[in-house]
A protein has these predicted regions:
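Extracytoplasmic gate region of multi-pass secondary transporters
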Residues: 29-30, 220-276, 331, 335, ...
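Structural signature of the two symmetry-related core transmembrane helices
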Residues: 78-92, 292-308
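Cytoplasmic helix-loop-helix junction between adjacent transmembrane helices
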Residues: 106-144
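Helix-loop-helix hairpin linking two adjacent transmembrane segments in secondary transporters
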Residues: 141, 145-190
Length: 343
């Protein structure tokens, strides 16, 4: 199992499913407003539904750097397992929610637990894949996010056939069961265990404090430029991903059971295409110009601007779907170059 040539890809395969569950569980709520508002009347207000989506993102954003600090200091296998188990349990419990406040707090807990996953998973993959396979391994893992986003769109379809409560229950049970699979087969990289022990054995006066590290980070002007660079497209990006099912249903006059899968598959497939195109283009451009990745990312970001306008003003199937495809390709091109730019 732990063959040095095979097991690194077993890790990618195991975590690919976790990545799928990560985006599936967070995305499915955006398609289930229609089914849920019959029982939870507060969801008839767009402001209340928006608050559910926003609390997750706020907590996810604030927890991400904390998650990175934790991942550097503990066994990442158990962090991944614990993260998956908690957010899957939260998904299961959402099926028992009887009012808006219960949903709100469960969504907040999901933000904490899901934020712990990505830093741990990416660093775990990076440690198991040294050299030429690292970028490919990370890229394969990221495709799990797009597939999960697409599958999450079927939450509305499942809710229409069964019930929204049963949909949350079964999606949660799948994640809880898979966390048990990870306990058996996912392994921490031995190098990381050695590094953690060295940190633990380092005299306290020689250990860099978290506060000093954050102080150094926040006083670096380059950090703020990068922060704005990531934040600017995230505002329309997450608004689009969270509200696109509703927009499709309203603009095209189709039931949410159809609008959910159509919208999420449109974004997921086009984003995947954008990632591939953006990666190929930037890899070639950077060989001729050191700013090639930055320019490629800027092109992708620029494509999202007309797409957002078309999404807002379009009322025909072709215009709305076309705008969704354009947005996904542009965001995928932008997304493909984020991490390489940082590295």
């Amino acid at each position: 199992m732990k063959n040095k040539n095979i097991y690194p890809w077993v890790v990618v395969g195991l975590l690919w499913i976790v990545a799928l569950l990560n985006y599936m569980d967070r995305q499915m709520l955006s398609t289930m407003q229609e089914a849920m508002k019959v029982d939870i009347v507060e969801l008839n207000k767009a402001e209340a539904f928006g608050a559910l989506m926003a609390i997750f993102l706020w907590i996810y954003g604030f927890m991400s750097p904390v998650a990175g600090i934790i991942a550097d200091r503990v066994n990442r296998k158990w962090l991944v397992v614990g993260s998956l188990f908690v957010w899957s349990a939260v998904t299961f419990l959402m099926g028992y929610a009887q009012d808006f406040h219960e949903l709100y707090w469960l969504r907040a807990i999901m933000g904490i637990s899901e934020a712990l996953y990505i830093p741990s998973a990416l660093s775990l993959i990076a440690d198991w894949h040294e050299g030429k396979s690292r970028s490919l391994a990370v890229g394969v893992h990221m495709t799990g996010l797009y597939v999960g986003q697409a599958i999450g769109g079927f939450g509305a379809t499942a809710a229409a056939v069964f019930s929204w409560q049963s949909t949350f229950h079964w999606f949660g049970i799948v994640g809880i069961a898979y966390s048990l699979v990870l306990i058996l087969f996912l392994k921490e990289n031995p190098i990381h265990n050695i590094a953690v022990k060295e940190i633990d054995n380092t005299p306290k006066e020689k250990k860099p404090s978290v506060i000093s590290g954050l102080s150094l980070l926040f006083t670096n002007w380059a950090f703020w430029i990068i922060l704005i660079y990531f934040a600017a497209p995230s505002l329309p990006g997450w608004a689009t991903k969270n509200w696109l099912p509703t927009l499709f249903a309203d603009s095209l006059n189709i039931p949410m059971a159809e609008a959910g899968p159509i919208s999420t598959i449109t974004i997921a497939v086009s984003s995947f295409i954008g990632v591939i195109l953006g990666g190929i283009l930037s890899d070639r451009w950077v060989q001729k110009n050191i700013r090639g990745r930055i320019y490629t990312g800027a092109i992708g970001l620029g494509m999202t601007i007309p797409a957002l306008l078309l999404l807002g003003f379009g009322h025909s199937f072709i215009s709305v779907i076309g705008a969704g495809l354009l947005f996904g390709i542009g965001f995928g091109i932008f997304d493909a170059n984020n991490m390489p730019i940082l590295c």
